[in-house]
Amino acid sequence: MADLAKIVEDLSSLTVLEAAELAKLLEEKWGVSAAAAVAVAAGPAAGAGAAAVEEQTEFTVVLASAGDKKIEVIKEVRAITGLGLKEAKDLVEGAPKPVKEGATKDEAEKLKAQLEKAGAKVELK
């Protein structure tokens, strides 16, 4: 273990030019390429970054609260979901609850506007 600590200490004291020369020597000795290893290591990270930048395509419309006009919100939830009166009432009273999952952006915005017009507070996730 002391030998490894000494190697780490020696490597830490190298200049950038010396480290580059060491990398070349090791590539030749072991028959590998450091550039390929860096590309493989960076590949998944670059893919994750691209996924985070992509625009969300599916949304969940969540009823945060019914607000003051609970009856109007229940009517709107029934119209949107096709639920019966009792099920729609339970959904509204149990807020926050999802009203619609897997909606497109346009559909989610439309549903949000309908519910907010009825007096509900709505979130898109």
Swiss-Prot record:
Belongs to the bacterial ribosomal protein bL12 family. GO terms for molecular function: mRNA binding; structural constituent of ribosome. GO terms for biological process: translation. It comes from Methylorubrum extorquens (strain PA1) (Methylobacterium extorquens). Keywords: Ribonucleoprotein, Ribosomal protein. Homodimer. Part of the ribosomal stalk of the 50S ribosomal subunit. Forms a multimeric L10(L12)X complex, where L10 forms an elongated spine to which 2 to 4 L12 dimers bind in a sequential fashion. Binds GTP-bound translation factors. This is Large ribosomal subunit protein bL12. Forms part of the ribosomal stalk which helps the ribosome interact with GTP-bound translation factors. Is thus essential for accurate translation. Coiled coil: none annotated. Gene3D superfamilies: 3.30.1390.10, Single helix bin. GO terms for cellular component: cytosolic large ribosomal subunit.
